[in-house]
Amino acid sequence: MTQKDISSTIKFDKMCVTYYANKLKSCKDRGIEFNLTYTQVKNMLRAKRCQYTGITLTKSQGSLQRPTDVTIERIDSSKPYETGNVCAVSFAANQAMNNMEQWFGRNSINAMKKMTKYVSKHNAKLK
C-alpha cells in the first residue's frame, strides 16, 4: 500500500466516523430510531452512484456538503434507519426528496422514488 493509499484510507475512515457520529446525534435529536452499525454505514458510504439519479457520488471534504456528496436516505421516512429501508444517494437528491415529501406528502414521494429507481435502472441498461 502506498503512502497515498494509506492517506486516502485514513481520510475516508475519518469521514465515516464523523458521519456516523453526526447521524446518531441527529437521529437522537429528532427522535428517529437508528438501527445501523458503523460497518453498515461505512459500506454504504463507499457507494459510487446515487441510487435515485445515477450521478457519481463524492465524499465529504469538510463541514459543508456538496450536492454530489454521498448521504444515507431512508426509503420510507416513517420507518427507522435500518437495513432494507436505507440507500446511498447524493446530498442534493436527499434534500429534494425531503422537500417534495413536505410539499406533496409521503404517498406522492414514495411513488416518485419508485419512478426514479426505475428510470435509474433503465438508464444503467442503456450504458
Where do the PLM segments sit?
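Contiguous alpha-helical segments
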Residues: 1-51, 103-119
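Residue-level signal for secondary-structure boundary elements
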Residues: 27, 49, 98, 123-127
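Histidine-centered nuclease catalytic patch
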Residues: 32, 54-88, 97
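Short, cysteine/histidine-rich loop/knuckle motifs that typically chelate Zn2+
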Residues: 50-53, 92
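Short Cys/His-centered divalent metal-binding micro-motifs
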Residues: 58-60, 86-114
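Short Fe-S-cluster ligation motifs
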Residues: 82-94, 117-127
